[in-house]
Every structure is written in C-alpha cells, then in structure tokens.
C-alpha cells in the first residue's frame, strides 16, 4: 500500500513537472514573439559609402580603397542586425555606384539616389559606413558623426562610439561630433542618422587591421551593440 502511494506521488510529480514545462515554453514563446515583433517593426537603412567609379579615400598602398572596406563592414553589420530580427535595407550590396550609365555627373547622381532611398525607405535608423583619412599618418581611431541638432542621432552616435571603442580601440580618445555639412546626414529624414568613420585608412597599422576580416567583424559588432544599446 505504501509503495502504491509512493508511485502515485511520483506520477503526480511528473505530471506537474510536465505541465510546468509546457506552460513555461508557451510563455517564453509569447515573450520571444513579442520581442521579435518589436525588433522587426524597426527598419534600418545601411549605407556603404562610395562604390563603383568612386573609390573614396585611398590607403598608403594602392590596393586599399575605402569603398571595399565600407561594403565589407556594412554586409557584416547587416548580418548581425538581421540575426537579431531587424529589417535591414542596403543602399548597395556590391561594388557599384548608384548612378546610371548616361549620368554625366556620376557623383551627383549617386548622392541623389542615396537621398531618394533615404526618403522612400521609411527607416527608423540610418547608418552610413565610411573610412577616415588624413595627410598625417599618425592619426587613428573610429569616430561617429551625427547631424547637428538631431538629439536622437546624438544619442545613437554616443552609444555606437562607446561600443566601437570597447571592441576595437579602448585607448581611442575621439568623441562623437556634430556635423552640419555632410550631405548624407543633412538629407536623412529618419529620427536618428549617423555616419561612422571606422578608422583611418591612412594609418598603416589601422589600415592593416581594417583589411582583416576578423577586425571588420569587430567593427560591425561594435556598431551593432551600439544600436542595440
């Protein structure tokens, strides 16, 4: 008789445990669905600067050009964001300019097309990826710019700058900077827009790092973490 009671108690314990597990999985599913809904309701427009006939800044060696680094980092950032459930739109996904074969002024046509994409995307965030340059090769370090007077952009820039420093350049003393002249920022209609200079392509050590896929992943991850923050 005692053995029967013990078996019944064990059976009930198993039933209760199974019900609890089922309930937990259902609740977890609802929470996860809610989080995914929040994330996927946010659209991010990623802009890999330059491309095609516009190489952007050049490194100390002729093999290193800005447009290639911009695209490599932007594609990695796209992957991280999509894995997290964000909707992502790209201005370009390959080495091409945003202009037509008959456009006389390709740079002007390219910037006009980027402006159109920004206006029609309906994105919540805009992130433009670039590489910095300076005649003096001593200068280094990532820096994030935002449109002057754009508080949401300033907040996003601050978060991205902190995370970039943490993952790629702990000793970097550069701070976020307001800008009132960058065409791409001045014409961004979304609530928050930033331009990320990932590093100085004219600094030999930083340029070597930026060409490394492992370092590009760190840069992309730093930007992603700043967006998540």
Residue ranges and their predicted role:
Residues 1-229:
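Catalytic-site microenvironment of enzymes
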């Amino acid at each position: 008789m005692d053995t029967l009671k013990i078996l019944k108690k064990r059976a009930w314990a198993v039933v209760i445990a199974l019900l609890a597990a089922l309930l937990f999985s259902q609740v977890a599913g609802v929470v996860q669905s809610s989080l995914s809904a929040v994330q996927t309701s946010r659209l991010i427009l990623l802009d890999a600067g330059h491309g095609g006939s516009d190489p952007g800044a050049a490194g100390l060696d002729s093999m290193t050009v800005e447009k290639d680094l911009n695209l490599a980092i932007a594609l990695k950032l796209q992957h991280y964001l999509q894995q997290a459930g964000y909707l992502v739109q790209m201005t370009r996904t390959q080495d091409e300019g945003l202009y037509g074969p008959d456009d006389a002024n390709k740079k002007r046509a390219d910037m006009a097309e980027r402006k159109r994409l920004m206006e029609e995307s309906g994105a919540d965030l805009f992130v433009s990826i670039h590489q910095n340059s300076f005649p003096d090769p001593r200068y280094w370090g990532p820096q994030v710019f935002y449109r002057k007077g754009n508080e949401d952009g300033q907040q996003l820039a601050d978060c991205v700058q902190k995370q970039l420093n943490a993952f790629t350049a702990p000793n970097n003393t550069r701070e976020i900077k307001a800008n009132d002249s960058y065409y791409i920022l001045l014409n961004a209609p979304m609530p928050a827009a930033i331009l990320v200079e990932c590093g100085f392509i004219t600094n030999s050590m930083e340029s070597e790092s930026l060409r490394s896929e492992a370092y590009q992943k760190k840069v992309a991850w730093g930007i992603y973490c700043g967006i998540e923050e």
